[in-house]
Regions:
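Conserved class I S-adenosyl-L-methionine
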Residues: 5-67, 80, 84, 101-104, 163-194, ...
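Class I SAM-dependent methyltransferase SAM/SAH-binding core
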Residues: 72-74, 78-123
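A short acidic, Gly/Pro-enriched loop at the edge of an enzyme's catalytic core
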Residues: 124-133
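A short SAM/SAH-binding and catalytic strip from SAM-dependent methyltransferases
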Residues: 132-146
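A short glycine-rich, Lys/Arg-flanked "PGG" loop and its adjoining helix->strand segment in the class I
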Residues: 147-162
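Acceptor-substrate binding/catalytic loop of class I
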Residues: 167, 171, 200-213
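Short alpha-helix
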Residues: 206-229
């Protein structure tokens, strides 16, 4: 999760508070219910520093020329990445576990858009070897076990197809938790719960963090070859008022890690 400094919470932004830290699989009730604040989150996502000027541009840059390519967006949310890919000529399909998010994506993309309510890590109602690319933007870190999700995404990709993804950076997560007074073991896979407040609504979200080698091992086990690992900067057109001080003075540690994987 990309945490902004305590002194940086622009209007419409998301404020966060670390609630708990655990290696247990069980989480609090109602956690990760994006449907409960879909509209508020989608509105913030449109213009926030983290999404509009950092993560989404980086994903589009890694995707590069997508004209004519069939792309599946896994965990599409309200569809901002899907729309950007379609505007670049891609033939797009998306799914999300939140029906509320899928409805917002349908309003954005139109009633004829290929959108599904489905959960990452469960079997998808899609045929084998269908897509040239799959994008997974900030979704894998909600899962304890990446194996089933990666295997299913590999199944729907054509041989040689690409999985383009972003996840929380394990180095940044470990540093944040240490600054919060916790004692995380870097080599462990563990989860933490944060309280998000956006537009006056407060929800609990749970994220799983794991070391870099656990990520790369999971990719290889699922039948992927790593072709790119990226830690991109923010875009140069970011409005200055959105830049946290630690970004402006170059003291910022990238909070997301990006990969391009090839289906082998």
């Amino acid at each position: 999760m990309c945490r902004m400094p305590n002194d940086h919470n622009p209007p419409g932004g998301i404020s966060t508070r670390l609630v708990s830290f655990s290696a247990d699989s069980a989480g609090p009730p109602g956690v990760n219910d994006y449907g409960s604040f879909a509209g508020a989150y989608a509105a913030s996502n449109e213009t926030s520093f983290v999404n509009a000027y950092y993560e989404r541009p980086a994903m589009l840059a890694l995707a590069a020329d997508v004209a004519g390519r069939r792309i599946l967006d896994a965990g599409c949310g309200s569809g901002p990445l899907l729309l950007a890919l379609r505007e670049r000529g891609a033939i797009v399909t998306g799914f999300d576990k939140s029906a509320g998010m899928v409805e917002l994506a349908r309003r954005r993309l139109g009633d004829d858009a290929g959108l599904l309510v489905a959960e990452l890590g469960s079997p998808l109602p899609l045929p084998d070897d269908t897509f040239d690319d799959v994008t997974a933007s900030l979704v894998l870190h909600y899962l304890e076990d990446w194996g089933p999700a990666l295997a299913e995404l590999r199944r729907v990709l054509k041989p040689g197809g690409r999985l383009i993804l972003s996840v929380d950076h394990p180095f940044a997560e470990n540093l944040w938790h240490r600054e919060a007074g916790l004692k995380p073991e870097y080599s462990a896979t563990y989860n933490y719960v944060v309280e998000w407040t956006v537009d006056g609504q407060t929800v609990l979200l749970r994220f799983w963090t794991r070391p870099l080698h656990a990520m790369t091992d999971a990719f290889t086990a699922a039948g992927f070859r790593i072709t790119v690992i990226s830690e991109p900067p923010v875009t140069p057109d970011t409005p200055r008022e959105l830049l946290p001080l630690n970004v402006a003075d170059r003291q910022w540690i990238p909070c997301f890690l990006f990969f391009v994987l090839e289906a082998v």
